[in-house]
A protein has these predicted regions:
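Short alpha-helical segments and helix-capping/turn motifs at coil-helix boundaries
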Residues: 32-37, 73-75, 81-85
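Solvent-exposed loop and beta-edge segments used for protein-protein assembly and interaction
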Residues: 42-44, 81-83, 145
Length: 460
């Protein structure tokens, strides 16, 4: 948790998509990662972009498993847990970011992640606040609600709106029902006031789940969800109609995985159901479709032509731990793990393979041509950084970081050092000094946009 006086907004780990190796693995985490694969992105203002990220890393304070199954996250899986003295923001990389409790109108800023978390409850932020103008782009009801939280990683937006799902009360429930101890993503608002809305079911078996999205262009997407029992019945019907022996497909899944609680609800397809520009010309097939293993793991991705474009295989013992993935028409890339769940081997039959050896503050990467790199690290959790790299050719490069993980200096293989001076508040680079002592300066406006730069020769 967060201690009084500790920096707020510190993550439980480095970003899974940061330092990567091969196809790809994050050696600082020992995790198999897929930083981002986009399945759906129609152009327009504030468009609905459906992308998938995978990480085998397991946080100690996970959000529930999302509709893409264990290990996978999509942007809509952002979630805020409200604990007694701590706010835990679960990002779409499977990590936990820890903030101190906020009062209405108060904000927390993560310097290491460049992320603001603001609690509603005030019509305006202080005039000098970096988010004051962006705050005014929000509808008044969002700004004034102390029960909503808003997050952004830029003074230019967009806002991620964290609220709760309105639900149908039970017959014997005492009203008004208390709000849940968490907040989920209900929409996005950009700096022009345009909105993207996530429609969540108010009741029934999919209560609280996203079943529809309206983007900034007014297009409406329907997200088709399935339960484990429905997928099991479909598998039995397909087996009987094909005359095959039905596979073992359980009607229920265990309620908990290493990646969090699991209700077994999965996304099976996304349809475009309304387009104001082409209301009579809607596609007759889903824009993307997903296939699932009997254990509720993402097995396949099909595009709008119903062509399989991706396939995934998982460990028999550990649900959600990816051991192979493949692009259609290419060979499987396979992975092996140690007893701590860290990737030790990456096998590529059509290219370089890698092995990973983990020691305290040191990771050794060896490829199939017997070339070796050694990464030396400092820090823990979200502030872990690579401070020295021994390259395969014998050269060494080094880096220095400040207390919040920002880069201060880099020394190349010849011993030449370049220094970086970040702004204390924003983390933006304001000055770069090259090894010969020549300096360049950079200036920004209130929205963190670069407005001017001065070179070593004084020219602006």
């Amino acid at each position: 948790g967060v201690r009084i006086g500790a920096p707020t907004g510190v993550a439980c780990s480095v970003c899974p998509g940061g330092v990567t190796s091969g196809h790809p693995v994050n050696p600082l985490l020992g995790a198999k990662v897929l930083p981002g694969e986009t399945d759906l992105a129609l152009p327009g203002p504030l468009p609905f972009i459906l992308s998938r990220t995978y990480s085998s890393y397991r946080t100690k304070t996970p959000a529930p498993v999302g509709s893409l199954g264990p290990g996978w996250k999509m942007p809509a899986d952002i979630r805020l847990q409200l604990r007694d003295n701590t706010l835990i923001l679960s990002d779409n990389g499977g990590r936990s970011l820890y903030f101190e409790h906020l009062f209405p109108g108060e904000d927390g800023y993560s310097r290491s992640e460049s992320l603001w978390l603001v609690r509603g409850g005030v019509a305006k932020l202080d005039e000098g606040h970096r988010l004051a103008a962006l705050w005014q782009a929000l509808p008044e009801e969002l700004r004034l609600s102390p029960h909503r939280y808003l997050a952004t990683n830029s003074p230019q937006g967009p806002w991620w709106v964290l609220g709760w799902c309105e639900r149908v009360p039970e017959a014997d429930e005492v009203l008004p029902a208390p709000l849940p101890p968490y907040r989920v993503l209900t929409g996005l608002v950009d700096r022009f006031g345009r909105t993207q809305t996530f429609h969540r079911e108010a009741g029934g078996e999919f209560s609280g789940e996203i079943t529809g999205v309206t983007d900034g262009a007014g297009r409406h997407f329907r997200l088709v969800l399935t339960t484990q029992a429905q997928r099991a019945e479909e598998a039995r019907q397909q087996a009987s109609s094909g005359g095959a022996e039905p596979s073992v497909f359980p009607d229920t899944l265990p309620g908990y995985t290493e990646y969090g609680r699991d209700n077994g609800i999965r996304l099976s397809a996304v349809w475009l159901t309304h387009d104001p520009e082409y209301p009579e010309n809607l596609p007759a097939a889903p824009l993307v479709r997903y296939g699932w293993t009997p254990r509720g793991e993402l097995a396949a991705v099909y595009d709008r032509s119903n062509t399989q474009v991706r396939s995934f295989t998982y460990d028999d013992k550990y649900r959600g731990r990816m051991v192979a993935h493949r692009h259609t028409g290419r060979p499987d890339i396979r992975y092996r793990y140690d007893s701590d769940g860290r990737v030790t081997e990456q096998l590529n039959p059509a290219g370089l393979s890698y092995t990973y050896q983990y020691e305290k503050d040191r990771i050794t990467i060896t490829d199939s041509l017997d070339r070796r790199e050694v990464l030396h690290t400092q820090g823990e959790g979200g502030l872990k950084r690579m401070v020295k790299k021994e390259h395969a050719d014998g050269s060494v490069t080094q880096s220095q970081f400040d207390a919040v993980g920002g880069l201060k200096a880099q020394t190349d293989a010849a011993g030449r050092t370049t220094e970086y001076s970040p702004d204390v508040v924003t983390g933006l680079i304001t000055r770069i000094t090259t090894p010969d002592g020549r300096a360049s300066a950079f200036y920004y406006n209130h929205h963190n946009q670069l407005t001017s730069a001065t070179g070593p020769d004084g020219l602006e």
